[in-house]
């Protein structure tokens, strides 16, 4: 990745750095070690809890000591998926990135910007010497993608801040003040396969490195087959 052309430069510098560190969900030990080393190198108070959450504190700049303490939070794990024709071991291999026009992409794998860009933003702020701020606490939680176990394991007193800003969002310039939450549902049922009618229309959609549902909807819209599918109850098989 040529981070020199990406802005803010410090954010993308640290994003490139953490792309070199494997961080699958539930296997975050290498990125935890990286964060602890970062804290030591910058002379910042750093601690971890029993599940691996990391907290790095940065004192206020002179004259800002009386401001409320702000917590910045992001998760350090990433979704690890790759194209079938790509050789990649997420436990040892770095993420290879490439700038494609206005997009930063990974070569045949997930990029890990969720939530690596949040982690990189926090590291850039912690390393900065030209930003005025009150007391800061940067919280890095584990295992968001497969259960939120890091967030659920947080205990009173681990952080002391008054305001928490979560950096795991979609777009810049938007601030969420609440959410609908989430839930897990487990269902059990008896599955009995049946033969599909011979006069039905079948097709298979194969897409690499893209959102299959987004592409499928666009395909239906552009080929005008949505009304046909609705009228004739055609089967769709996802790969």
Regions found by a protein language model. Give the residues of each.
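Acidic/His- and Gly-rich active-site-bordering loop/insert found
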Residues: 2-102
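Electropositive phosphate-/nucleotide-binding environments in soluble metabolic enzymes
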Residues: 5-12, 25, 29, 116-119, ...
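Buried hydrophobic positions in well-ordered alpha/beta secondary-structure cores of metabolic enzymes
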Residues: 22, 39, 56, 72, ...
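Midchain, well-structured core segments that form catalytic/ion-binding scaffolds
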Residues: 22, 94-96, 101-109, 144-147, ...
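Flexible, glycine/charged-enriched surface loops at secondary-structure junctions
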Residues: 47-49, 135, 237-239
């Amino acid at each position: 990745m040529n981070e020199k052309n990406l802005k803010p430069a410090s954010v993308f510098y640290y994003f490139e750095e953490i792309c070199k560190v494997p961080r699958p969900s539930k296997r975050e030990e290498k990125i935890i070690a990286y964060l602890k080393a970062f804290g030591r190198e910058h002379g910042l108070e750093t601690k971890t809890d029993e599940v691996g959450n990391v907290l790095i504190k940065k004192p206020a700049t002179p004259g800002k000591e009386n401001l409320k303490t702000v917590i910045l939070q992001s998760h350090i794990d990433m979704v690890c998926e790759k194209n079938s024709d790509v050789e990649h071991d997420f436990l040892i291999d770095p993420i290879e990135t490439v700038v494609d026009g206005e997009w930063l992409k990974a070569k045949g794998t997930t990029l890990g910007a969720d939530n690596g860009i949040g982690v990189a933003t926090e590291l850039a702020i912690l390393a900065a010497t030209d930003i005025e701020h009150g007391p800061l606490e940067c919280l890095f939680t584990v295992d968001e993608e497969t259960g939120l176990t890091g967030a659920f394991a947080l205990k009173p007193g681990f952080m002391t801040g008054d305001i928490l800003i979560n950096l795991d969002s979609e777009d810049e310039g938007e601030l969420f003040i609440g959410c609908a939450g989430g839930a897990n549902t487990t269902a059990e049922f008896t599955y009995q396969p049946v033969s599909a009618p011979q006069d039905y229309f079948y097709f298979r959609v194969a897409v690499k490195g893209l959102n299959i549902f987004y592409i499928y909807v666009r395909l239906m819209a552009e080929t005008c087959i949505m009304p046909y599918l609705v009228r004739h109850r055609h089967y769709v098989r996802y790969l």
